[in-house]
Amino acid sequence: LGATQTTDALAAHAREQIGRLARAVDTAWPSILVAHAALSDAVLSGTERTASLGRDPALSTRAFARSEFDYVALGHIHRYQNLNTEGAPPVVYAGSIERVDFGEENEPKGFVLVQIDDARSPRATSIRFVTTPARRFVTIEARIPVGGDSTAIIVDAIDRHDIKDAIVRAFYQGDAEDVAPPDTPSLRSALKDAAHVALIARRAATPAKVRRAPITEEMNLAQAV
C-alpha cells in the first residue's frame, strides 16, 4: 500500500474499533474513551502544523462523539481544546503541560478536571481547565531607526521583558538597509538571566506594496501595459 492508502486503512480500522468499544459499553456505569490520535478538525500549534501534515489517519470528532461515552480524553495535540462544545460527550485534548516551541508561546498549559454526574439521567459531564506553571517562551522585537544605535536599542527592548528562566529569541529590524549589526556579546550579556537564548536575528524587511496605476476603458493596450 502507498502512504495515502495506509493512512486511510488505519483510519477505517480506528473507526471500527471505536464502534466496537461503544457497543461494548455497559451504560449502567460511566464510560470514558481514551485515545492518542490527531483529529482532523483539531487546532494545531507551532511545529505540529508541519509535523502532522499528511502523516496521521484522518479521524473526525464525529467518530469519537458517541453517545455511549460520557467523556472522550484525547492526547497528541498540544493545545487544550474541546472539539464537541455543542454536544455530548465532551471530546477534549487536555494539551501538553509544557511548551515545546515558540508557536505555543501564548498558550496556557494545564490539565482538565472532569466531573461526571451519575445522579442525572442522562449523565451530565462538566469539564474545567486548570492552568499550571509552564516554561515560558519570550519573543523580543526591536526596531532600529535610521542612525540608531542597534545594540543599545535591542538591549533596551530586552530590559522591558521578564526573561528570567525563559526560552528567548530576539529579532530586530532596521529602517535603513545599512543598519549596523548589534554587538552580540553585549546582547548575550543582557540575556544572561534567560534559561536559553534560541535566536538573535535580523528580520527581513517587508517589501512595500506598490499600488498599480488604474486601467481605464479609454486606454489602448500599450498604455495599459
Q: Predicted segment positions?
A:
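His/Asp/Glu-rich metal-coordinating catalytic cores
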Residues: 1-92
